[in-house]
């Protein structure tokens, strides 16, 4: 679903009506929530919205390619309040978090973040959130697009652990790009530069309560700014845009181009409930030697023992420049046999290539393998290549 602003009207594409922005009843109803930054993003030029975690997310500030250049040359501010938080507290909160994920958290310090997986009893991935440890027994899961709140509450019922699982009033923004550090210094002072990659700290900006982490969904230098009072969303957005004016800051949206360059996953596209961590090469996020009987442990042991039947790979497509990301899964063929699918594809103007993430039969996953992709009624040649496509060691993001 994509909502598009046309002139003074908000149109729901593939639907038969439009609502003006002045209509108080704009939207699909209260089941799809607006973020605290919604009005600000419209003022700053958002022309299209998608739906993610039952919320509107800005997806169109004009040219996606220009958004990409803004990101990698200066900085962009993205409304990612759709990364809804699951808050876990209580005397057994740490034990519960370790039950929920196969990643070893024994060295996770207070003030640290970790990229984790949440899997079901069959080892299928339910979400790939960032975990934030605010205190000894106080955690947030910053979610991808699925209802982990319900899953966590369900697991807690029979866990025998003392935990409280809720959704807090927390709405993140992402400030990403090489100039993001300078903008943050202008807002919070030089001490913000001491914040290390994948760590967090509590801040207050003119009475606005925040948690700031050195994380983001861009593979660029960046920060996530977690607002802890939704009533101050408009004020926060304006303060950041004002501070970034002299640094080339632009309003923007998460860049499909940059995240595919960086090999970053998009849940529902590159991973889902039928995908296991080993197929994605995420063995490091699974600790099968743990004494904890975490959800999915037995299934993951069996998958590891039996071996995977398919694998995620990088692909270069040899065709005309793609006009935008794929909106369907494109079949990958070995002659007449379907052996996989393209999950995310885009043209990279920096690399001057069509690049993609794909899931293929393990027999065809070797680097250099030449295959074909069916794009609508065309057959396109392709080659399996190394991923990520750019900055594979994440030196930019961690700098």
Which residues are covered by each model-predicted region?
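Acidic, proline/glycine-enriched N-terminal capping motif
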Residues: 13-116, 124
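Conserved beta-strand and immediately adjacent loop positions that scaffold enzyme active sites
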Residues: 2, 74, 115, 329-331
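Single conserved hydrophobic/aromatic residue that forms the stacking wall/gate
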Residues: 1-14
